Amino acid sequence: MSVLVITGTGTEVGKTVTTAAVAAVAVAAGRSVAVLKPAQTGVRPDERGDADEVARLAGAVTTLELARYPEPLAPATAARRAGLPPVGPHEVAEAAAKLAVEHDLVLVEGAGGLLVRFDDADGTLADAARLLDAPVLVVASAGLGTLNTTELTARELRRREIGFAGVVIGSWPESPDLASRCNLADLPAVAGAGLLGAIPAGAGAHSPVGFRAGAPGWLAPRLGGTWDADTFASAFVP
């Protein structure tokens, strides 16, 4: 079963565009891809969600959203306030396993960070990853403050004995500041895992054709791309 869980060090760090890039590269390689969004928050029933955006950018992927809540809150809180049933880790794992039967790759995109609560039983994305025995790809921000949140996420993955695939910078600025440039070396050091890509800021605004053409150059070979961490860092020496 090939399942990759994608989490962030927080909200708005580029999880969806990173998920789309991984999906686009896999689709271009001829793999069948499914994208699972366990809980979509802050989106009305008539609006497009994160899984829809991944499909728009990446192309021919299967999408599945298990639950949707209108308020932009943690899933457990959003479900409770909406009077709707929450989604638990076992439901997430079961849905991912079913998708894996008919797809070469299943991408599970979380909400917020690794320990954001899905339900009132304190279930998290980490619990779902453990049930699936699936590695977790961590999407981090580029600038000041990212080292602490990335290291905390990495430590929690190791404490729970969950596979840690590596780190992707979800939005690399066009003109990176000193902290961002230094973090190219510091992020993999504090994470204890490789830097597996850097998505250009604004990549989600590209046309689908442009996004799919660019995606391989944003991701390392371990994610199916051609991006090289050393070559990238050499262009941004602090």
Curated annotation (Swiss-Prot):
Q: Name one Pfam family in it.
A: AAA_26
Q: Which CDD domains match?
A: DTBS
Reactions listed under catalytic activity:
(7R,8S)-7,8-diammoniononanoate + CO2 + ATP = (4R,5S)-dethiobiotin + ADP + phosphate + 3 H(+)
Q: Where is the active site?
A: 37
Q: Where in the cell is it found?
A: Cytoplasm
Query: Which coenzyme or cofactor does it need?
Result: Mg(2+)
Q: Which GO terms describe its molecular function?
A: ATP binding; dethiobiotin synthase activity; magnesium ion binding
For binding ATP, which residues are annotated in this chain's numbering?
Answer: 12-17, 50, 109-112, 170-171, 200-202
Keywords of this entry:
ATP-binding, Biotin biosynthesis, Cytoplasm, Ligase, Magnesium, Metal-binding, Nucleotide-binding
Q: Which pathway, per its entry?
A: Cofactor biosynthesis; biotin biosynthesis; biotin from 7,8-diaminononanoate: step 1/2
Residues engaged in binding substrate: 41
Q: Where does Mg(2+) bind?
A: 16, 50, 109
Q: Tell me, what does this protein do in biology?
A: Catalyzes a mechanistically unusual reaction, the ATP-dependent insertion of CO2 between the N7 and N8 nitrogen atoms of 7,8-diaminopelargonic acid (DAPA, also called 7,8-diammoniononanoate) to form a ureido ring.
Family affiliation: Belongs to the dethiobiotin synthetase family.
Q: How does it assemble?
A: Homodimer.
Provide the protein name.
ATP-dependent dethiobiotin synthetase BioD
Q: What is the organism of origin for this protein?
A: Streptomyces avermitilis (strain ATCC 31267 / DSM 46492 / JCM 5070 / NBRC 14893 / NCIMB 12804 / NRRL 8165 / MA-4680)
